[in-house]
């Protein structure tokens, strides 16, 4: 789905919600290259720059203890690491109103 270099620390997994969200953002004309840049950094275990406002969701009903970052001001990525298996799960992407 998201093409990354073959050599990354974490293998990607996608939820069905993410797959549907991804199709939707492509139809909306979002620059998916921006998403790819962020996912590539996360898949390599790198820290995101401050501009992405990366944080853990502690009070979220659906995404508790997942990571969330801003691709654009109202375009989010929700993700989770499974460290013991070196997997990065892409859970959802979309606007605040679409996800929360």
Residue ranges and their predicted role:
Residues 14-41, 46-49:
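N-terminal first-folded block
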Residues 43-70:
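A short, surface-exposed loop/turn module that caps and links secondary-structure elements
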Residues 8-14:
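Short structural boundary motif marking the start of a folded domain
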Residues 39, 43, 61, 92-94:
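Generic secondary-structure microfeatures
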Residues 1-8, 20, 30-33, 37, ...:
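Enriched for short, Lys/Arg-rich terminal
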């Amino acid at each position: 789905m998201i093409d990354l270099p073959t050599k990354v620390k974490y293998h990607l997994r996608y939820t069905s919600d993410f797959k549907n969200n991804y199709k939707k953002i492509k139809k909306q004309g979002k620059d998916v290259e921006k998403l790819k840049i962020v996912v590539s950094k996360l898949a390599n275990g790198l820290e995101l720059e401050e501009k992405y406002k990366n944080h853990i969701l502690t009070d979220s009903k659906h995404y508790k203890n997942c990571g969330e970052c801003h691709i654009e001001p109202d375009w989010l990525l929700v993700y989770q690491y499974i460290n013991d298996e070196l997997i990065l799960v892409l859970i959802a992407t979309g606007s605040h109103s679409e996800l929360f």
